[in-house]
């Protein structure tokens, strides 16, 4: 009895741009297929397009994968470092007669295609050099795969079902260019074979490559992996996803204040479902994910849904963990957190209102920095002459405290209102504007507690002076 092969998947981006949401979703599905089956996940950088590939794009891909937490078991492998292996296999194919040198000039190929188009025929290589005898020449040549002339390629796609392509529709694919560089479709085949890939998850734009790659695998005597070609992501208007819909690099989502858990949860549901469940932890994704449950129809990107998920995770994840991500935004916004409350306390205090970590960081600034001016509208409304007495009394009571806690501060605010025989709002609103500079904050007792005793007293004094100047002006 033979032991079943371990499930092995790969994510193989080309480093010609950032890791966008479509690529990130493909990476997630491939990663989940491996993790759900106790398998292995390989990261491979397909950089054979030497002119367009950049190190910056490579770095962006790795940064995006790391930020998302999509860890890999092997790699990253780089195709440009495997040219010797590709040339070795091409040499073997030339010897076996499954590949051949093609000396057709560019002009001949163009003329051939024009004639085929004029005759209403499919434009494909006509096999002119397919059976040429070996010859010694300095003429430039490409190397082509000798595709079968009869029969068809059949494979069962997990998303699209049974697919059959006649070999008559396929031409003899170029597997090595005139400059000696192997082509993408060939390198992919050798890599998948060498790396033992059992499951290929990729975008539907690759589906036309699959029968060509299967034929090369058969010619090499290599096993055929299973395939799942996922549909494209559209904008909410039904058009192809673009920057105006949110098609930006994964790291831009970090910069905009999204948690990786929110983006992963959003992406997994963008074409896959498990009942009516909307919220998925990574463990739940691994538990329930199956390639066969991926939807065939294209999915529409909805930023509002992503924001909703982000709010959920900001509110429900461990505050210490959220704070570890918030720290990046505090630094990015030049907020010095060394003189103020712990970031986890800020997360707990502000998470109910925050849509993003970027927004949360900006709204927390007054906990760490003294503001120059009060909000003009709020000051005009609440820092008036009638606020002088409650601000003065509450400052006196706060200054006398020997214990600084939320409950004690709350009692001071209540006692001030009782003593002055006014409603809590007559004390609370001027006090809130005094210590935050604005009209919104978490619960006032918690806000003062987090700002701290000395800083709170200083700000109330500033507000008292502001009101006094206003009375005297």
Curated annotation (Swiss-Prot):
Localization per record: Cytoplasm
Annotated catalysed reactions: tRNA(Glu) + L-glutamate + ATP = L-glutamyl-tRNA(Glu) + AMP + diphosphate
Binding of ATP, residues: 243
EC number in record: 6.1.1.17
Motif range ('KMSKS' region): 240-244
Motif ('HIGH' region): 13-23
Example GO biological process: glutamyl-tRNA aminoacylation
Cross-referenced SUPFAM superfamilies: An anticodon-binding domain of class I aminoacyl-tRNA synthetases, Nucleotidylyl transferase
Cystine bridges: none
Protein name listed in UniProt: Glutamate--tRNA ligase
Lineage, uppermost ranks: Bacteria, Pseudomonadati, Pseudomonadota, Gammaproteobacteria, Alteromonadales
Gene (name only): gltX
């Amino acid at each position: 009895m033979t032991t079943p092969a371990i499930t092995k998947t790969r994510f193989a981006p080309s480093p010609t741009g950032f890791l966008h949401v479509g690529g990130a979703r493909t990476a997630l599905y491939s990663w989940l297929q491996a993790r759900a089956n106790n398998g292995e996940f390989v990261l491979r950088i397909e950089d054979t397009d030497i002119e367009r590939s950049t190190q910056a794009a490579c770095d962006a891909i790795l940064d995006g994968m790391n930020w998302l937490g999509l860890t890999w078991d092997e790699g990253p492998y780089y195709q440009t470092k495997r040219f010797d292996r590709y040339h070795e296999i091409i040499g073997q194919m030339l010897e076996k007669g499954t590949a051949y040198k093609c000396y057709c000039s560019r002009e001949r190929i163009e003329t051939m295609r024009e004639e085929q188009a004029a005759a209403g025929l499919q434009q494909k290589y006509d096999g002119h050099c397919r059976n040429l005898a070996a010859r010694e020449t300095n003429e430039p040549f490409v190397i082509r795969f000798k595709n079968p002339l009869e029969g068809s390629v059949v494979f069962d796609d997990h998303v699209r079902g049974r697919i059959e392509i006649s070999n008559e529709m396929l031409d003899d694919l170029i597997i090595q260019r005139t400059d000696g560089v192997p082509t993408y479709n060939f390198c992919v085949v050798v890599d998948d074979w060498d790396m033992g890939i059992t499951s290929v998850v990729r975008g539907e734009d690759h589906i036309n490559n699959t029968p060509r790659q299967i034929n090369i695998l058969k010619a090499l005597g290599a096993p055929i992996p299973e395939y799942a070609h996922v549909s494209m992501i559209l904008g909410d208007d039904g058009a192809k996803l673009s920057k105006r819909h949110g098609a930006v690099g994964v790291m831009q989502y970090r910069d905009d204040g999204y948690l990786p858990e929110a983006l992963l949860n959003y992406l997994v549901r963008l074409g896959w479902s498990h009942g009516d469940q909307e919220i998925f932890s990574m463990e739940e994704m691994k538990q329930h994910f199956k390639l066969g449950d991926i939807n065939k129809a294209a999915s529409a990107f909805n930023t509002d849904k992503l924001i909703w998920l982000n709010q959920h995770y900001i509110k429900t994840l461990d505050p210490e963990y959220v704070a570890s991500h918030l720290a990046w935004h505090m630094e990015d916004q030049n907020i010095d957190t060394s003189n103020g409350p712990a970031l986890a306390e800020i997360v707990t205090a502000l998470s109910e209102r925050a849509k993003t970590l970027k927004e949360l960081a900006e709204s927390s600034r007054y906990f760490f920095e003294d503001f120059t001016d009060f909000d003009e509208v709020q000051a005009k409304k609440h820092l008036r002459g009638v606020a002088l007495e409650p601000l003065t009394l509450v400052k006196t009571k706060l200054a006398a405290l020997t214990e600084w806690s939320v409950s004690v501060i709350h009692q001071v605010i209540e006692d001030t209102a009782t003593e002055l025989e006014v409603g809590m709002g007559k004390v609370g609103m001027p006090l809130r504007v005094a210590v935050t500079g604005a009209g919104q904050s978490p619960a006032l007792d918690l806000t003062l507690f987090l700002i701290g005793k000395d800083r709170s007293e200083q700000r109330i004094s500033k507000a008292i002076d502001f009101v006094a100047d206003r009375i005297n002006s």
